[in-house]
Amino acid sequence: MHQHDSSINVNVAVLTVSDTREMEDDQSGDSIVASLEEANHQAVHRSLVSDESDEIATLVSGWAASPEIDAIIVTGGTGPSPRDVTPQAVLPLFADALPGFGELFRQLSYQEIGAAAMLSRADAGWIDVGLLRTPVFLLPGSPKAVELAMGRLIIPQLSHLLTVCRGKKTI
């Protein structure tokens, strides 16, 4: 297993998907930004959209094509309700999946919330646009789930993931 390089500062776009939240009360988005800043990464773009597949896909694909964005984190819309369309919007954009992320997230969630963890469709993968390879994480909208994903999975591996998927010369 390779040692991760935590010295790389990562520029991240943060998207909250919600029909009920406004930017002013977006606790999950705030938590993502705070976690990034604590790890010396930057939230360079932040948006909030409703649970509309086309809006989500358009924003995520646009961000993935931007050379100033290294990674994308989406929170919300990953549950089992008919309005939860984040996976349907984003997964078709993936060139490759990172299945271990969702598996580990549900395992860690199970330790905290029990069988309800199986309702999560948290996921991750890469979007390739030209020479850009952008990791994308899909998180639940719950602030506790975001804290778990950021603290235990994303922040500890984000710099290393960028090094591996883009190569040291392009970072």
Please annotate each region the language model reported.
Residues 86-171:
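Proline/glycine-rich low-complexity loops and linkers
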